[in-house]
Design a protein with these regions (language model features):
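Beta-strand/loop substructures that line and gate deep hydrophobic ligand-binding cavities in soluble
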Residues: 94-110
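Short, conserved charged micro-motifs
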Residues: 22-29, 84-85, 116-118
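Terminal, regulation- and interaction-focused segments at domain boundaries
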Residues: 1-42, 51-52
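Ser/Thr-rich, low-complexity intrinsically disordered terminal regions
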Residues: 32-85
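Short, solvent-exposed coil/turn segments at beta-strand boundaries
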Residues: 22-23, 69, 100-101
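C-terminal partner/receptor-binding element of secreted or periplasmic proteins
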Residues: 111-127
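Short, flexible, solvent-exposed loop/turn segments with mixed acidic/basic and small polar residues
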Residues: 5-10, 64-65, 94-99
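Short, surface-exposed coil-to-beta transition loops
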Residues: 89-93
Length: 127
């Protein structure tokens, strides 16, 4: 897992997984794997899967990296506490999955809750 700052301000965790290093064959397989982790978690709640690839390609001026085969986000929330109204601005969580010919790139922003952050790291590392 690599930690980086994207665009000089977004704390991001990313892992590139060669298709030869996993039994998962597609973006949908990776999303289903993560959804199973969310569904098994006592607090996490699945919200939606967003097909970013289809959305961006449907736009008149949409630009997609030609190396991408697919790109989706799985959206979910841990939300055990809501101490401040502003917390909604950093929720829910999202894990992005981009598929290329050779690999999957799985990424997510740092979570404000260290336990939630650790769960996401573990889920991605288990792929």
């Amino acid at each position: 897992m690599k930690h980086l700052t994207l665009m000089d301000k977004y704390p991001l965790n990313a892992r590139t997984i060669a298709k030869t290093q996993t039994t998962l064959k597609s973006t949908d397989d990776v999303i289903a794997f993560i959804k199973a982790k969310i569904d098994a978690h006592p607090v996490a709640t699945y919200i939606a899967t967003f097909d970013h690839y289809t959305h961006t390609n449907s736009l008149e001026n949409g630009e997609m990296n030609p190396d991408f085969i697919d790109a989706k986000n799985i959206i979910f929330c841990f939300g055990v506490q809501l101490p401040k109204a502003e917390m909604l601005g950093i929720r829910p969580r999202s894990i992005g999955v981009v598929e290329t010919e050779e690999s999957f790139v799985v990424s997510f922003m740092d979570a404000p809750n260290p336990q939630a952050h650790q769960f996401m790291i573990e889920w991605v590392e288990a792929i």
